Amino acid sequence: MSARPGQASGEGAGRDAPKRGAAAAGRSGPATVPPAMDRFRPRAREIVTVARQLLEDEGLDSFSMRRLADRLGVRAPVIYKHFASKSALVAALISVGFEEQAALFEAALTSSDQPLTAMAAIYRAYGRDNPNLYRLMYDRDLERPLLLPGSEERAVVPAVRAAGEDRDLARAAWAFAHGMTILELNNRFPADADLDAAWRRGMASLDPSGGVTGLERSGNGQD
């Protein structure tokens, strides 16, 4: 049975283990646990930080524990003292990404009168700014048991609230935002396509009347 992200294997296992709070239990949980990076010991945080840089520089296909060890200037076994497997390290990266998005979503929920539109724009911008981490998070199978407890839930809760607790609407907005974002990252649109116009049209179609979510046909200044 593999350890969770940041959990050491063998002697001293659990020294870097994420703190388990109410996050895994209920809706209020994600807000009660520390941010992902704060749940690692300093050496594990350094590994995650450098791993993220390596991922963005070279992509997932070239990402390996050996390449990471080279960049850190250590031998691979040093990494395995903090992350039991490559899958555990990948899950740590994904957890950090979820919590970064969650913080942005939570801010939009309190600062925007069109929170669902604002969150969708944040989601797209996050993918553009972190393309390989985004692909890691959303374009491959997700090993949920390895995630830091509460990280995925924390990113989901603001979107559901922005959709007026309508989970179907929240899922539809996510599906649209992901489809546009991943196609854009993979250069699948014609070079002359007006993606901002398509984005506004798609978001408006989710709630043509404006509705309780505050979506409008005009979008939210994303062009």
Predicted regions: what is each one?
Residues 138-174, 193-208:
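Amphipathic alpha-helical packing segments from all-alpha helical-bundle domains
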Residues 92, 106-133, 151-156, 170-173:
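Hydrophobic alpha-helical connector segments
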Residues 1-29, 154, 179-187, 212-223:
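C-terminal regulatory/oligomerization modules of transcriptional regulators
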Residues 77-78:
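Key DNA-contact positions within bacterial/archaeal DNA-binding proteins
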Residues 3-6, 125, 166-188, 194-206, ...:
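Hydrophobic alpha-helical segments that form the core
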Residues 41-52, 56, 61-62, 73, ...:
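An amphipathic alpha-helix adjacent to DNA-recognition modules
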Residues 124-146, 182-190:
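Amphipathic alpha-helical segments used for helix-helix packing
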Residues 1-58, 65-71, 88-91:
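Basic, helix-initiating cap at the start of DNA-binding domains
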